[in-house]
Amino acid sequence: LGTGSPGPPQPETRHAALRGAALVLPAVMAMRQVQEWMRTHDEPASWDGLLHRRCLMRPCSVRAGASKVLQGTGGPVVRRTGRAGWELIRTTVEVRVGGGSWQVTHELARRTSADLPAMTGKLTEPGTAFDPMTGGALYRLTYGDVAAWAEATGDRNAIHILPRRAAAAGLRTGPDAVAAHGLLLGALSLAVAAPSSQQQIDLRFIGSADVPVARCGGGGLWARLCVDAASGDIAQGRRLVLRRR
């Protein structure tokens, strides 16, 4: 990830990025199990078009000497409901990472009616918005970053890889942009505003971060994101895309 400053990232920036990736690892491991469950129980392409709405990670205690990364053996518990043209999917799974165990809940959504209007990102509410120039740090997110995350995590949902697919799934994403992974935004949030030890982590994806694939007009080939250094909330422009609880 690039910061708003010219030149290569500083060592502390790289260290923070590694910390954010490590903190979101339980959610990534859980998502892999959910993806495998979907492939087993649904059509092969059922992963494409799913929208990530929320991720909740709760720490649990495990016995000493647990393996470094061990996925829970029970598999995900999946609940599916329909509401107003959307399929809502809630999954819960336990994963073990390092010496800790986490119960991870992912909330996903899929549009089932093409006639529905696109979802709109929730604007920052009066009194809770922050000034991007004074209340947070600026970061650049490129399509290369999104593609690298897809390769590393195995989440190759078409909305993150192919232009127009996010809009078809129900997001207000431009024709030359993709939607960044929710957990990639979560890693960025946790890198900038690390939680206290063993604190539950609640990531709410209330809008899409649109990342351009091709240059549009005079704009650069990156998304400009502002991360609040205190809360970890992320905004693109004045539009909030991630809120931490």
Over which residues does each language-model region extend?
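Hot-dog-fold acyl-thioester-processing enzymes
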Residues: 1-52, 117-123, 127-196
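Residue-identity detector for glutamine
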Residues: 10, 33-35, 71, 103, ...
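HotDog/MaoC-like acyl-thioester-processing domains
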Residues: 51-141, 207-211, 218-245
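Catalytic-pocket segment enriched in acidic/His residues
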Residues: 166-241
